[in-house]
């Protein structure tokens, strides 16, 4: 009998029942909530008179709509200028209070982006099923967890039953071998992968990232890669448990203690794919061949190495793809064969659930230390992923490095990743962003988003256009 993949093991542990239509009912260990996708779910519970099935399986925090300036964060929620944003944050507070859910409220130092604080607090643990009303819940798979986003109706279902109806996925292995050169990061790995297999390449798959390169990554780097598995079309991204996983979790507030910890670790060590496990698809990447990546279009698959040029649609033989390239270039205001390094930036954003952890801020600070943001850049901002990340960065003096260079040092939140709060691009503005999506209007109506790593974003802020961070730091 063939061995099992990590995904297969976690599925089998959590499958409650199989249904006649081929779907299954799976048990959910951890449910994370935020202010945008939860209000209707709570209202549904009230209307039906249903209690929560397991209150302590849920944690919550506001992140999408919270402002990131000190002026709007001081005092009560009344300081939030936008009425819709204020209402959503207030509603989350009220719902959590009414149903007894533990919430990191807006001005709690532990507040932050859901996919940053879950692991940070130890609320995400190896072997868990983790869901949240947000597609980038795949981030938590970095801990050997089965994690994915759900819709609002499913949020209500999990609150009421602690179970979810879903279809079992196929298995994909992405194997990355070799040593990354300095200045090439986890963000570049996942962008290179998406460039290779496309945004539909992972459709229907749970993706396990493996190989020597992945094992060498920090937990922060693994979270970055799993975060963007969704941009490759997969619903799930995961990495097998190893000593780095266990060390990261140890001592965190929600992590097991004492004998419970010992028992948990013994179980976690088995959360790896068996040597003879079968994968339905295997994709291989060589770390040495990966260079710093920059997206130039309106999809994460529209990506090139920094030393390359914008593609020419006339060289595309597929008429559908050709039309897509033409539309993207028009929206982005670029010409075929423009060098990536010729793209000038109006704004730079370092943050989001992809790249706002302490390792990301350290990498960016290393680049900007002793340098200044280019005068042509209208705004450069750093938004830590949580209050604890912000506090740690300030202990290390990173805030001073950024401020002296001309960056704005903000309060935690989703910020400019998406146009749901005051941090937005103006029409036609180009932004070097460490976020995960570059769709039309993602950061503001008419805004032009270029996805990069924190180091590349920092280098672009200093130069005023894209540059190879490896050259800048020589």
Swiss-Prot record:
Binds 1 [4Fe-4S] cluster per subunit. One of its GO terms (biological process) is L-leucine biosynthetic process. Pathway: Amino-acid biosynthesis; L-leucine biosynthesis; L-leucine from 3-methyl-2-oxobutanoate: step 2/4. [4Fe-4S] cluster binds at residues 353, 414, 417. Its cofactor is [4Fe-4S] cluster. The keyword Transcription regulation does not apply. InterPro entries: 3-IsopropMal_deHydase_lsu, Acnase/IPM_dHydase_lsu_aba_1/3, Acoase/IPM_deHydtase_lsu_aba, Aconitase_4Fe-4S_BS, Aconitase_4Fe-4S_dom, IPM_dehydratase_rel_enz, IPMI_cat. The keyword 4Fe-4S applies. Its EC number is 4.2.1.33. Pfam families: Aconitase. Keywords: 4Fe-4S, Amino-acid biosynthesis, Branched-chain amino acid biosynthesis, Iron, Iron-sulfur, Leucine biosynthesis, Lyase, Metal-binding. GO terms for molecular function: 3-isopropylmalate dehydratase activity; 4 iron, 4 sulfur cluster binding; metal ion binding. CDD domains: IPMI (cd01583). It is an enzyme of class 4 (lyase). Coiled coil: none annotated. It comes from the Bacteria. NCBIfam families: leuC, PRK05478.1, PRK12466.1. Heterodimer of LeuC and LeuD. Catalyzes the isomerization between 2-isopropylmalate and 3-isopropylmalate, via the formation of 2-isopropylmaleate. Belongs to the aconitase/IPM isomerase family. LeuC type 1 subfamily. This is 3-isopropylmalate dehydratase large subunit. The lineage of its organism: Bacteria, Pseudomonadati, Pseudomonadota, Gammaproteobacteria, Lysobacterales.
